[in-house]
């Protein structure tokens, strides 16, 4: 599997802190044994028992990293990343978040996929709304949008984000990921790298 060792994670955190950077630890779950699917498609046909088993294992994993993050003085921690098919399991997530809070004293977020962040019903249990912001900003065929077109494309997205914040008591939004490659067409499908 591609999991770094705890020693490697600690080294990276310490190196970032030595440079004066703040650190968010944001563990990812990848499906190494299933290259045709991604983390947002975990368990689409799971039974309730299978979901409970999955969340028990997930909680063990994520609290391990929360404790590591706390020991290293990490400033922010993401309780999950783009686990789209799991977000409707509110009771399970609230239990995971409570277990993470018992280990980690800093700010907590969840890195919601841009298509799925509005569907998370438990933002109130976290300190920040996290969005992996790979929004398409150009129409199909527009490989080189102008600055004005990009600014215009952001306006409805900013309004949607403001609504998401307002619906959650004015909670702040953090872009937990954002990126556009330096190539023609990147603004159409920025997640496709």
Identify the meaning behind each predicted range.
Residues 1-86:
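Substrate-binding cleft and catalytic face of glycoside hydrolase catalytic domains
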Residues 3-9, 59-62, 93-95, 148-160:
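Well-ordered, non-membrane alpha-helical segments in soluble/globular domains
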Residues 10-22, 70, 93-105, 161-168:
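Surface-exposed amphipathic alpha-helices with a cationic face
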Residues 11, 26, 107-109, 116-192:
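Glycoside hydrolase catalytic-domain groove-lining segments
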Residues 22-29, 75-88, 96-118, 170-178:
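Aromatic-lined carbohydrate-recognition surfaces of secreted/lumenal glycan-active proteins
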Residues 35-54, 91-99, 184-193:
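Short, electropositive alpha-helical surface patch
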Residues 42, 55-58, 97, 126-127, ...:
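Short, isolated positions within intrinsically disordered regulatory regions of eukaryotic proteins
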């Amino acid at each position: 599997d591609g999991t770094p060792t705890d020693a490697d994670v600690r080294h990276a955190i310490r190196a970032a802190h030595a440079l004066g950077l703040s650190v968010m630890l944001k563990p990812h779950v990848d499906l190494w044994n299933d290259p045709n699917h991604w983390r947002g498609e975990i368990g689409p046909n799971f039974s309730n028992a299978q979901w409970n088993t999955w969340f028990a294992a997930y909680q063990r994993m994520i609290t391990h990293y929360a404790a590591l993050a706390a020991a290293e003085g990490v400033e922010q921690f993401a309780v999950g990343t783009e686990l789209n098919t799991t977000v409707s399991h509110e009771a399970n997530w609230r239990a995971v978040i409570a277990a993470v809070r018992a280990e980690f004293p800093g700010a907590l977020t969840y890195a919601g996929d841009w298509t799925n962040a509005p569907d998370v019903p438990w933002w109130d249990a976290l300190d920040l709304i996290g969005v992996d912001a790979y929004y398409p900003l150009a129409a199909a065929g527009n490989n080189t949008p102008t600055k004005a077109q990009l600014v215009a494309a952001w306006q409805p997205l900013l309004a949607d984000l403001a609504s998401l914040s307002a619906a959650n008591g004015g909670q702040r939004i953090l872009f937990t990921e954002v990126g556009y490659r330096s190539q023609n067409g990147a603004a159409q499908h920025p997640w496709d790298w």
